[in-house]
Design a protein with these regions (language model features):
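A generic transmembrane alpha-helix motif of multi-pass inner-membrane proteins
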Residues: 1-17, 194-247, 253, 258-259, ...
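Transmembrane helix-loop junctions in multi-pass membrane proteins
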Residues: 2, 22, 71, 83, ...
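Extracellular loop-to-transmembrane helix junctions
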Residues: 2-19, 77-108, 117, 160-172, ...
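Membrane-interface "cap" regions at the ends of multi-pass membrane proteins
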Residues: 17-71, 260, 306, 630
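Flexible loop linkers connecting adjacent transmembrane helices
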Residues: 23-50, 76, 86, 90, ...
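Membrane-interface helix-loop-helix modules in multi-pass membrane proteins
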Residues: 52-111, 122-126, 142-157, 342-367, ...
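Loop-to-transmembrane helix boundary motifs in multi-pass membrane proteins
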Residues: 123-141, 344-354, 427-429, 447-455, ...
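Extracellular/periplasmic helix-exit of transmembrane alpha-helices
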Residues: 275-295, 347-434, 469, 509-518
């Protein structure tokens, strides 16, 4: 019952926040005007600038910002206990994350769809524009390298997810043509597409799991370079190139719209399963996981400040400012839709993060299992206790996925930690959510095999929408940097997209911690702090926008301070901690990147301090229209 109560209270909190704080921001602070000219109308080109109904743009925006962030982050953070993670998700999303996304969207809408980095040049100063865009470029390169790897790993771990994810692409193209070329109604094709997606999940689970390990794995120079992860990464980047250069209505919008329906249905099933499991007493949060963990292993970073960079999406994420000001602002057809899209989508993501926390604690406590078999003949066998030969549940089940101070004896009689923070890799945390969510779905009578397929497709679909949106965003950033540096070839959308993906592929396909194709994991430790630093810098732009328009700034200024201090603190700990710091463990590449990111932050803050004195009430006019139009 405690699991259900926490879920219900969290969801009620989000609903109340939307209709109170969100509405106050929309009316009193940003003054949204349904009659105002928006970029999608003023710069309409049917490629990037496309006026779009709010239901469709909400689907694109939500699925793009969600990705695997609100899954992996909370799945890791419950290591410190479910209560700190829950508080940061609920309070962070209401007062920081949703304000950040909403503010970035409005600022971009009022500046002809320019990115937050471009707007920084006018609100703070020309150097601030270049600094912000450079941080965006670094962050998006890491996102592309990591998310390509994430999807490839999911396809590798869960072959049953592959068919449904790829079936979605031709469905999206058909729906895009139906809506934008023929003006057809969107309801019926959406329902049909949703049905086909779930049929494909069943086919993938029971008949046709697509496992490329049966095909690829060619050894070259003593290493298996053409492994499953490498092949899927290459295929995904080719897809991203095509999706990024096509008009948004052709593939990006309809795919995200289909995704949003599929994902919302999956989330509703999870909530129903959670409710049934909670009411029947099978899902017991407090019996499964500690509210605040007391047996933290020595290799774990401190909860303060690392909680704030571990859970990004689901509370606040700098990547969201790129989506708000990169793709969404170019498609919103009325200012009055901005609260629904910007503030509302972030609260829904917070709801997803709450479900993840409960799935990784109470859901895992319902039982854990191992995958046995290959091809379509695989099954899931429960892990049993050695003494009683009965399936482990509650805390005994939870510690199989979140081992903390499990010890082993060395040859000399001393002990060492087995598990701990080092064991919390990407696979383990994705599996924790998939397994816990599968248990919730099983409470509804859905077979575990089908439930796991639904959960795996959920994760892969979120990550895929983020990947293709991030590719388009990186193209915008490269375009703006190229304009600033007068590099004309990179202002071409095909060349800019190819440059973005070749660079990301070069990182992703390197020999990394998990072998060929895991190079993105090398830069993974940078992502958390760099991503959250972007949120702090985006808040700085929002603050200056409001300051120059003589608006109250406290509601954005306080989050700005938090999101500038916490990521910097975490980054410095990662760089200089005597036991684990990059400087002292020989991770000089990470240390070098850390120095660059911290230097950029300090420089950006200095630019803000310089501009502050003359900013209030001094709002700069927009540049001539032709200088803003994209290639």
């Amino acid at each position: 019952m405690n699991t259900l109560i926490i879920a219900v209270l969290s969801f009620i909190g989000f609903i109340v926040a939307y209709h109170t704080y969100g509405k106050w921001l929309a009316r009193k602070i940003f003054g949204l005007d349904a009659q105002a000219t928006v970029p999608s109308q003023e710069l309409k080109d049917d490629v990037d600038y496309v006026p779009t109904k709010k239901e469709i743009i909400f689907g694109h925006h939500f699925t793009s910002i969600a990705g695997t962030g609100p899954i992996v982050g909370p799945a890791i953070a419950v290591f410190w206990g479910w209560l700190p993670a829950l508080l940061w998700v609920v309070l962070g999303s209401v007062f920081i994350g949703a304000v950040h996304d909403f503010g970035a969207l409005v600022v971009s809408l009022r500046n002809r769809g320019q990115s937050v980095g471009e707007v920084a040049g006018r609100m703070i100063g020309p150097r601030a524009k270049f600094l912000f865009l450079f941080v965006l470029f670094i962050g998006l390169t890491i996102v592309l390298a990591i998310f390509g790897l994430v999807i490839a790993l999911i396809f590798s771990y869960y072959p049953e997810s592959v068919l449904s994810v790829w079936v979605e692409i031709p469905l999206a193209v058909v729906i895009g043509l139906w809506i934008y070329r023929r003006g057809g109604n969107i309801l019926i094709p959406s329902i049909v597409a949703l049905g086909i997606m779930y049929i494909a999940m069943g086919v993938g689970a029971y008949l046709l799991p697509i496992d490329l390990s049966q095909i690829f794995g060619i050894p070259l120079l003593g290493q298996t370079y053409l492994n499953v992860v490498v092949v899927w990464t290459l295929v995904l980047f080719v897809y991203c190139f095509i999706a990024s250069v096509l008009p948004v209505w052709t593939l990006l919008q309809p795919r995200d719209f289909i995704n949003s329906h599929e994902l919302v249905l999956a989330l509703l099933l999870l909530v129903l399963g959670l409710a049934v499991a909670g009411l029947t007493g099978r899902a017991d949060l407090t019996a499964s996981a500690p509210a605040i963990a007391s047996d933290i292993p020595p290799d774990a970073p401190p909860i303060w400040p690392f909680l704030f960079i571990t859970i990004a999406c689901g509370a606040v994420s700098g990547f969201h400012c790129m989506v708000s000001s990169g793709t969404s602002s170019k498609q919103v057809e009325s200012e009055s839709d901005a609260q629904y899209v910007g503030y509302g989508a972030m609260l829904l993501e917070g709801g997803l993060a709450v479900i993840v926390i409960l799935a990784c604690c109470a859901g895992i406590g319902m039982g854990v299992f191992n995958r046995v078999g290959t091809g379509a003949n695989y099954t899931f066998e429960p892990i049993v206790a050695a003494e009683s030969a009965t399936p482990v549940t509650n805390h005994d089940a939870w510690i199989t996925r979140y081992a903390t101070t499990t010890t082993a004896t060395n040859a000399d009689g001393t002990t060492r930690v087995v598990g701990g923070w080092a064991s919390h890799n990407l696979k383990a945390k994705v599996s924790a959510f998939v397994d816990g969510g599968g248990n919730f779905l099983a409470s509804l009578g859905i077979p575990l095999k089908m439930g796991i397929a639904i959960m795996a497709v959920l994760v892969a679909s979120f990550a895929a929408t983020t990947l293709d949106t991030a590719t388009r965003l990186q193209r915008y950033v490269i375009f703006e940097l190229a304009q600033t540096a007068n590099i004309k070839p990179l202002t071409n959308r095909y060349i800019a997209t190819a440059f973005a993906l070749v660079l990301a592929a070069a990182v992703a396909l390197l020999q990394g911690p998990s072998g060929p194709g895991s190079g993105g994991l090398t830069l993974w430790p940078l992502f958390g702090a760099t991503n959250q630093l972007l949120a702090g810098l985006a808040f700085m732009v929002i603050v200056f926008y409001l300051l120059r328009r003589n608006k109250p700034i406290w509601f954005a200024f306080l989050p700005m301070v938090v999101m500038l201090i916490m990521p910097a603190w975490a980054m410095l700990h990662q760089m200089f901690d005597p036991q684990t710091g990059w400087l002292f463990t020989g991770k000089y590449l990470l240390f070098g990147f850390g120095v660059v990111v911290e230097a950029l932050q300090i420089w950006m803050i200095a630019e803000g301090v310089i501009a502050w004195r003359n900013a209030r009430g001094n709002y700069p006019e927009l540049p001539p229209l032709e200088s803003v139009a994209a290639d």
